Each structure stands twice: as C-alpha cells, then as structure tokens.
Design a protein with these regions (language model features):
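Flexible, solvent-exposed loop/hinge segments and secondary-structure transition points
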Residues: 2-207
C-alpha cells in the first residue's frame, strides 16, 4: 500500500479531523441560516406593507374614514351569520373618523360565473351599505366584468352603486327582487349580491 493511501486513511480516521469538519459544517449552516432568516424578515415586512396598502386602498373605495384599523378578531357569530348567506367572511376592519367609529369595511367572498369573487363592502354604524369594491377577479370579459366594473344599469345607476344605502331592513337582497342585473351577467350579479348579503349579516353580528 502506498504512503499516499496510508496518509488518506489516517486523515479519514483522525477524530480531530472529523470534529473539525463537523464544527466547520455546523458553523457554515448557522451563518447561511442566519442570512436567509434576515433576508426573509426584510421580504416578509415589505410584502406585509404592500398588502396593507392595497387593503387600505380597497377600504377607501367603500367607506369614508380617516383611520383604518387592523382586522378585527372574527367571532363565531360573525362567521356563522356570514355563512348562512352563502358567502365566506374573510376579514372585518373597523373604520374611524375623528376618533369615532363610523363603520366597517368587510372583506367577503362569493361564487361568480368564473370562480370566486372577492369584494370589500363598506357598512356604516346604521347598518347601511356605503360602497362595494371588487378585488381583481376572473369574471368573463365583457359580461361578468361589466358587473365588476360597476357599469351603469338601464336607470343610469352603477350595478355596484345600487347597493349603497341598502341594509338588513330591506330584507335579503336578491336579483330580480330588490337588485337589478345587467343582461347576460346574471350569475355575476347574483355572486355580488350574495357577497353584500354576507357582509350585512356579518356586520349585524358584530357585538
């Protein structure tokens, strides 16, 4: 056996060498993990800030206020009331002006013709709708998108604007009864209506 092979075997079996290698690998992993954690922390904060800016922008479209709180904790009563209307309650934000609560911005989801419609619904302290805003969606271009884009109805009122002022006192909102639909976009109109009913129910369950 050559001296080179003997030396290699000696190095491979040397406990000090193994310990040194183990420590080196451990420290390297720790440094890499630390760097990745730092980068992730910075990225996470930036993503959270951008998401919050978009959320506030959506809330500003549906209710007038100068202060928007973080999402409230959803209660069982709120989620149950929302589910009973056929939609899904995602988040509820309390809104204030001059330090006084002026209403809520409620993020809900409902089924549309091409998938889930996510929307923000503003509701004042009297329980009346102050506005409806649709989050980017997959509704059909030219038909469902007319509803999403708040296109005017025959009477000139925007299809989303028609919900403003409506409340639980009007009973369950329904297309053909107390809600109008754009011709050819009935499914999308029903989806938005379900979302508004869901938001109204959730608001009514806020303690």
């Amino acid at each position: 056996m050559s001296n080179e092979v003997k030396t290699k075997e000696k190095v491979d079996m040397d406990p000090k060498y193994i310990i040194k290698l183990t420590v080196t690998l451990f420290l390297t992993c720790m440094v890499v993990a630390g760097i990745l954690g730092w980068v992730n922390s910075i990225t996470k904060d930036k993503i959270a800030a951008i998401t919050w800016e978009k959320t506030v922008a959506a809330m500003q479209q549906v209710i007038t206020a100068d202060d928007f709180s973080d999402a409230m904790e959803l209660t069982d009563d709120m989620t149950a009331a929302a589910a009973a209307q056929g939609g899904t309650l995602d988040a509820v934000y309390e809104t204030r002006s001059g330090g006084q609560v002026v209403g809520y911005a409620i993020n809900v989801e409902a089924s549309g013709s091409q998938g889930i419609i996510s929307m923000m619904v503003g509701i004042d302290t009297d329980g009346a709708v102050t506005g409806v805003s649709i989050v980017p969606n997959a509704e059909t271009s030219g038909i469902g998108s007319k509803v999403m884009g708040n296109e005017p109805l025959a009477n000139g009122t925007g299809v989303l604007d028609q919900f403003i002022g409506k409340s639980a006192a009007d009973g369950t909102l329904a297309v053909g009864t107390n809600v109008d639909a754009i011709t050819g976009a009935t499914v999308s109109s029903k989806g938005v209506t379900t979302g508004v009913n869901t938001a109204l129910a959730a608001a009514g369950a806020i303690g």
